[in-house]
Each structure stands twice: as C-alpha cells, then as structure tokens.
Amino acid sequence: MADLNVVTLISIGSHPASGRPRRAEQDARAVELGLQLAGEKLNVVHAGDPQEETLRAYLGMGLPGLTVLEQSREADALPALAEHLQLAKAQLVLTGTQAETGEGSGMLPYLLAERLGWPLIVGLAEVESIDGNTAQVLQALPRGQRRRLRVRLPFVASVDSAAPAARQSAFGPARRGTLELSLIHI
C-alpha cells in the first residue's frame, strides 16, 4: 500500500469546553489511518489560513509537512479541494465526519465525492487491503457491528470514531514540520 496516493483533509477543531482552537478529533483519526496506510508519503491538506498555529498539532503526529490551500474563513473549501485532489491524482481521500467549527454540516465528503464522481464510504473503520484498483474496507455500523465492502479506487471516505485513535502530538516534530502554501485558481 506504500505506492497508494493517500490524501487526508484536515480542519481546525474547537475544544468543547473552552472553545479554543485545537486539532479536530475526527480529522486526527483520519490522519492516523492515513499514516498507517502511506507512512510519511501521506499528503495532508487544509483549506484555510496558512498562519493558523493549530495546524502544527497535526505536524506533531509525525508528518514531515502539510499543504495549505490559502483561502478566507468564509470561502467554500469544496472547489479548491476538488481541484487540488484532481491535480494531485489522489487515489484515497480521508476526511473526518464533520467539522468542529464553521458550518459543520458534515456534507463535505458527500459533495466532494459527487463533484469528483468517486464512490463514498461513510464510517470507515479500517482499510484491510488494496489489490490493484480495488480496496477492501471495514465500515462501522451501529452497536459495534462492521460491514466488509469492496470499493474501486479512487474513493472518498469519512473516518468513523471506530477507526484507530490518533497518536499524541509531539512538540519537536510539530516545530520541525513544514507548511507548504499552494495557490489554487478557481
């Protein structure tokens, strides 16, 4: 699976008690799953402010860097993300289930899959194997049940809370990691 082009989309979260910016919990699970699949070759993308210090919490998970598609807080992330994913030739796109800040409708994975014309897996718990252009995955269902699915590449998947928990963010790697600014013209 090392040759697989995995992209994880991240956002800025909000602490439930204090409201302070933090690493979004579901997005961090998506990064963890991406790291298990692609290691340091994982591409992590954020659409928003490149000066957001909270992005370093994701770098602290062991990422050498991440890409920021610069845009205002009010801008729709969908067009920029779709164009970036097509240019990057992504094969597997991992997202959280719902943003913790902003609109937080949970529609991004659905709209992104529709725009790209790719299948969508909701509630991804694990990617078991990838054989050629097909992946075998486990989808989380209510009451701890799982469903094994086969899906063609490329596809979009929203990661469930049943996926592996995200590792802690370490200060050193968070400071050493790089933020690459990418300009997408829509």
Language model features with spans:
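Conserved acidic residues
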Residues: 64, 91, 154
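Short beta-strand-loop elements within alpha/beta enzyme cores
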Residues: 89-101
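Conserved small/polar residues in nucleotide/adenosyl-binding loops
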Residues: 184-186
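N-terminal beta-strand-loop-alpha-helix module at the start
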Residues: 1-47
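Active-site rim beta-loop-alpha module in soluble metabolic enzymes
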Residues: 154-163, 174-176
